[in-house]
């Protein structure tokens, strides 16, 4: 029976890096993890509340770098309309920064640096592509059309290969059995440790139940 490993953890230290960068004593390590979770959860909730549409302001990842007196948070986004640094200058970013310091007590005694970076090719990121697929499936678009469109979007981002997998009752018919459908184009060398493969696993709730979505991009 095949044993599946997370492609990101498998390549950690070679082609992948940590999203949290800090050091703690062993007794304080769990507290540091909880702090990171609270920061990410607060940012996600703020953007979900303030976003303009379901396709805008999609977060790829949140990087946290903590030192003794400074907490640096970098938000990597695609199609950012909310957290823009244009006009008015950094208003929403400042609002988020203030609400983050108020909500999370351990940041209050440290300096908080918050930055937003827009991705040049958003659909080359599996997290953003996975959320796009989830939105399309929620709007009852055919899963085959969604997978083909996802492949086209990745090709425009000049990637070497993509694999998309959707699992669940995806046909849209009553009393249908759950199944797995996948589509691959190009090279996706999952067994090669030095291959820089990005991965995302997410799910979406539809009228037919929960669908699981996995995206590999090389």
UniProtKB/Swiss-Prot annotation:
Belongs to the universal ribosomal protein uS3 family. This is Small ribosomal subunit protein uS3c. It comes from the Eukaryota. Part of the 30S ribosomal subunit. GO terms for cellular component: chloroplast; cytosolic small ribosomal subunit. PROSITE patterns: RIBOSOMAL_S3 (PS00548). GO terms for biological process: translation. The keyword NADP does not apply. InterPro entries: KH_dom-like_a/b, KH_sf_prok-type, Ribosomal_S3_C_sf, Ribosomal_uS3_bac-typ, Ribosomal_uS3_C, Ribosomal_uS3_CS. GO terms for molecular function: rRNA binding; structural constituent of ribosome. Keywords: Chloroplast, Plastid, Ribonucleoprotein, Ribosomal protein, RNA-binding, rRNA-binding. It is found in: Plastid, Chloroplast. Residues 39-120 form the KH type-2 domain.
